Swiss-Prot record:
Name of the gene encoding the protein in the UniProt record: folE2-1
Pathway the protein acts in: Cofactor biosynthesis; 7,8-dihydroneopterin triphosphate biosynthesis; 7,8-dihydroneopterin triphosphate from GTP: step 1/1
Enzyme Commission number(s) from the entry: 3.5.4.16
Species per Swiss-Prot/TrEMBL record: Burkholderia lata (strain ATCC 17760 / DSM 23089 / LMG 22485 / NCIMB 9086 / R18194 / 383)
Name the UniProt record assigns to this protein: GTP cyclohydrolase FolE2 1
UniProt keyword annotations, A-Z: Hydrolase
Length: 316
């Protein structure tokens, strides 16, 4: 069998290519044609992050010519494969690949190409308090690059996980503790600090506010002439705005510090969306925010969206 295959492969007879020789029945132009879910190693140059990541790529071109039966997917694959050569992803590099994809399909009258990359950016994160303690945190990233004629557009989407504590629940918890304290000490004209401390040690957490793991999915436009993608800067800005990003390695002192951060950053889902949007305004073009609180009080989630307010348009 192997000898037969070798003889066949060594023949010079051209192989048929029906995408060139056969006409498309009922020919119509197609908006996009290509591939999804291609495994690809890519390099990402972000401070404090692992450089090499495993990405999944989607790539397509338009097919305006109604008579052309199909595109040349192997051409797209080979051009996409060049992104795995170890060179760090950049706006210029992505734009170059898209131009090459369009050029490779001139026989299809192709004028547009698009590329989507999905990967986890692995960042080293220090503990809040403990010196020398750190761990790795993965941030899901999506890069969308589109070339339409001479117009190049690039967007980045990142997902940041954080903790949210409900302000209403916190107020109700404080009210319960307040009433319990008055019931215990309201009849006393003078209360010893030691007695108060002892009571608080036992009863201060008799009612606790509900909190939950939450996520912010943020998309921004990236400049075509940027030297890098600037992903970790975007992530840091989001985490700083929220104030309670989830931690990696912790000791008791770090867990206590995290509890203090949660207490100082009580927020509804509306608060979180507004915080992030305000932090991005003026720093990133066309920011769009979607936040989700995976409620511990309810079996459903609380969600909110935020987008830039257009001049002359109502805020809501």
């Amino acid at each position: 069998m192997e000898k037969a295959l070798h003889r066949i492969s060594s023949m010079n007879a051209p192989l048929p290519d029906i995408s060139l020789t056969d006409a498309a029945p009922g020919g119509r132009p197609l908006e996009w044609v290509g591939m999804q879910g291609i495994d690809l190693p890519v390099a990402v140059a972000e401070p404090g992050c692992r450089r090499d990541v495993h990405a999944r790529a989607d790539v397509q071109v338009d097919l305006p010519a109604p008579h052309v039966k199909g595109i040349h997917m192997s051409r797209l694959y080979r051009l996409l494969d060049g992104l795995g050569d170890g060179t760090a992803l950049s706006p210029a590099g992505l734009q170059h690949v898209l131009h090459a994809m369009v050029d490779s399909h001139r026989d299809c009258d192709t004028r547009s190409a698009r590329l989507r990359l999905r990967f986890d950016l692995l960042a080293r994160r220090a503990a809040l308090v403990t010196d020398g303690l750190a761990g790795w945190k993965a941030y899901p990233v999506r890069i969308d690059a589109t070339l339409s004629g001479a117009r190049f557009e690039l967007r980045a989407q990142v997902t940041v996980v954080y903790s949210s504590t409900c302000p209403c629940s916190a107020a109700l918890s404080r009210h319960w503790v307040e009433q319990a304290f008055l019931a215990a000490f309201g009849h006393d004209d003078r209360v010893e600090p030691a007695a108060v401390a002892a009571w608080l040690k036992r009863h201060a957490t008799a009612a606790t506010p509900h909190s939950q793991r939450s996520e912010a999915v943020v998309s921004v436009a990236l400049p075509a002439d940027g030297a890098t993608l600037g992903l970790i800067d975007l992530i840091d800005r989001i985490e700083h705005a929220l104030g309670t990003p989830v931690q990696t390695a912790v000791k008791r002192a770090d867990e206590q510090a995290f509890a203090v951060l949660n207490g100082g950053n009580l927020m509804f889902v509306e608060d979180a969306a507004r915080r992030v949007q305000a932090a991005l305004d003026g720093h990133h073009a066309n920011p769009r925010v979607h936040v989700r609180h995976l409620e511990s009080l309810h079996p459903h989630d609380a969600v909110a969206w935020a987008a830039p307010v257009r001049e002359g348009a109502d805020a809501c």
